[in-house]
């Protein structure tokens, strides 16, 4: 929707199945929020484990021409969250927050509604 491009199969670049290790089941991996972003305001700046199940991702250089910026990364260089800093709440994450116990993203979304 933002005009970015999709990396079709992450294991081809990263060499592991870390983002989708067991077919049909969520796993967890660590992401690190970028300081100064909405994601870091909501989740903190320290690395955190998130529920994951994906083999695709947004190409890291494909949003340079948009208002979006990446706001969390996996250690292998895969973008894990992006946001539009000019919007009230436009955040996209590559992980599955609905599959975990951490409701902070959902609470922040609800709180952003006027």
How would you label these PLM feature ranges?
Residues 1-5, 11:
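Catalytic nucleophile loop
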Residues 11-114:
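Amide-donor transfer/coupling interface in amidating biosynthetic enzymes
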């Amino acid at each position: 929707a933002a005009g970015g491009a999709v990396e079709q199969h992450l294991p081809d670049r990263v060499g592991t199945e870390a983002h989708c290790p067991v077919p049909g089941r969520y796993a967890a991996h660590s992401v690190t929020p970028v300081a100064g972003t909405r994601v870091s305001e909501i989740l903190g700046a320290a690395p955190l484990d998130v529920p994951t199940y994906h083999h695709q991702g947004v190409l890291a250089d494909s949003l340079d021409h948009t208002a979006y910026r990446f706001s969390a990364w996996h250690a292998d260089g895969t973008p894990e969250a992006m946001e539009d800093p000019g919007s009230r709440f436009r955040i996209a994450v590559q992980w599955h927050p609905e599959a975990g116990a951490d409701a902070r993203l959902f609470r922040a979304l609800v709180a952003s509604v006027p």
